[in-house]
């Protein structure tokens, strides 16, 4: 059990609003290392909730950062969010907004996004006003594409004038993440024979970099130097 004498270091991806409030109640000494880029996203999502906009968050709903970001809507009564993992899942959202032929029924939509949306989420009422944000370590191009597709669906169903007042978007990719993704893209213009990507197997950043590299050349994702055995000439890497 934590006590007021304990020192708690808040991670770079932040904590959910509820967890943060619980720590404050205990009176722990808090060392907040939440990344500045993450805080920017939080402020944007909170503003969406304040203005009555549902936050569409491009991210992994199981990731600590996405959960912390989504929780920021709770600062305002009635705040809503829905988390979309990738473009494939995004298509379910786009089709529902635009009411395209074959779109999911309300029940099927709710079932699919049951664990990825705010409590009491109603797709027929809560997709009238939308603001787009993202987990800061997602692929930048995909985040931008998802935002554009949401806007496109709005225009298709409601018209351009409606979209201009009911849709908001804001680029929230971490600058360091963007720089690394851009660097990989530049390197792949003259693809090397092999790429070695070093980082945690559970790191969203590192996994995205490895994914980008695999599209062009043989890629090995390793956690650290211990994964490379010089004597045997073998590499222990993520499949």
Language model regions located:
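The feature marks the mature, well-folded catalytic cores of soluble enzymes
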Residues: 1-239
């Amino acid at each position: 059990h934590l006590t007021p004498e304990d020192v708690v270091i808040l991670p770079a991806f932040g904590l959910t609003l509820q967890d943060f409030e619980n720590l404050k109640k205990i009176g722990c000494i808090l060392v907040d290392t939440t990344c500045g880029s993450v805080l920017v996203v939080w402020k944007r999502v909170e503003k969406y909730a304040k203005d009555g906009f549902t936050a569409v968050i491009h991210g992994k709903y199981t990731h600590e950062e996405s959960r912390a970001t989504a929780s920021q809507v709770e600062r305002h009564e009635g705040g809503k969010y829905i988390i979309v993992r990738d473009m494939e899942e995004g298509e379910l959202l786009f089709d529902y907004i635009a009411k395209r032929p074959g779109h999911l029924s309300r029940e099927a939509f709710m079932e699919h996004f049951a664990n990825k949306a705010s409590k009491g989420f109603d797709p027929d009422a809560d997709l009238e006003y939308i603001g787009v944000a993202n987990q800061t370590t997602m692929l930048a191009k995909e985040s931008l594409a998802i935002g554009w597709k949401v806007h496109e669906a709005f225009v298709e169903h409601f018209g351009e004038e409606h979209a201009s007042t009911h849709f908001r978007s804001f680029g929230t990719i971490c600058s360091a993440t963007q720089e690394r993704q851009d660097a990989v893209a530049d390197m792949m213009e003259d693809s090397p024979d092999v790429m070695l990507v070093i980082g945690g197997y559970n790191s969203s950043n590192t996994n995205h970099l490895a994914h980008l590299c695999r599209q062009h050349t043989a890629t090995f994702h390793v956690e650290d130097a211990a994964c490379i055995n010089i004597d045997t000439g073998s590499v222990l890497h993520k499949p």
